[in-house]
Design a protein with these regions (language model features):
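Rossmann-fold NAD(P) dinucleotide-binding segment
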Residues: 87-103
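N-terminal beta1-alpha1-beta2 submodule of the flavodoxin-like/Rossmannoid cofactor-binding fold
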Residues: 1-79, 84-92, 156-162
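Short, glycine-/small-residue-rich phosphate/pyrophosphate-handling segment
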Residues: 105-145
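A short small-residue
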Residues: 1-5, 45, 105, 144-153
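A generic structural signal for alpha->beta connector loops
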Residues: 32-34, 103, 133
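Glycine-rich phosphate/pyrophosphate-binding loop and the adjoining helix
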Residues: 29, 136-162
Length: 162
């Protein structure tokens, strides 16, 4: 089984990436699946102009990202909440593909520095994923107060709480 974890923030000083690292480590240590982080900060996709299938000369990184999604048995999206929504980098990546998302099992981890763990982003992300035909796991994983609960290496500071 192969799982892709999308680390969606490209922000300087991002904290949500810590959770991508945490889940990768957890899945590997428990031998649950082959796992890879697809870090949108590394891809740096240009602003969306056209879906991949309609691009005349798509960049290699775009084709590689699409192949990772297609070849994954499931996807975990790790996203911060920005003003009640998810970052433009994630919207850009979602819109870049279309058929690749259809019937793809997707779960998401929402992250915030506040008390609610990105609860507001759940609605907007869920709606976008439903519209493209993804199969969304009905149990998001909200992470509140990320700075108090995880470090930059993706380690839980309170192991009893994870």
């Amino acid at each position: 089984m192969k799982i892709s974890i999308i680390s969606s923030s490209v922000r300087i000083g991002r904290k949500s990436h810590w959770l991508a690292l945490y889940f990768k480590k957890y899945i590997e240590e428990n031998k649950l699946a082959e796992v890879k982080i697809l870090d949108l900060n590394e891809y740096q996709f240009p602003i969306f102009e056209e879906r991949l299938k309609f691009q005349e000369a798509p960049e290699e990184k775009t084709k590689q990202f699409a192949a990772e999604i297609v070849n994954s048995n499931g996807v975990i999206i790790v996203t911060p909440e920005y003003n009640g929504g998810y970052p433009a980098s994630l919207k850009n990546a979602i819109d870049l593909l279309h058929a690749e998302w259809k019937r793809k099992p997707i779960s998401f981890v929402t992250v915030s520095t506040g008390m609610f763990g990105g609860a507001q982003v759940t609605t907007s992300l869920l709606f976008s994923l439903w519209k493209i035909g993804a199969w969304v796991v009905p149990a998001p994983f909200p992470v509140p107060k990320v700075i108090e609960n995880f470090n930059e290496k993706g380690e839980a500071l309170d192991k009893e709480a994870t």
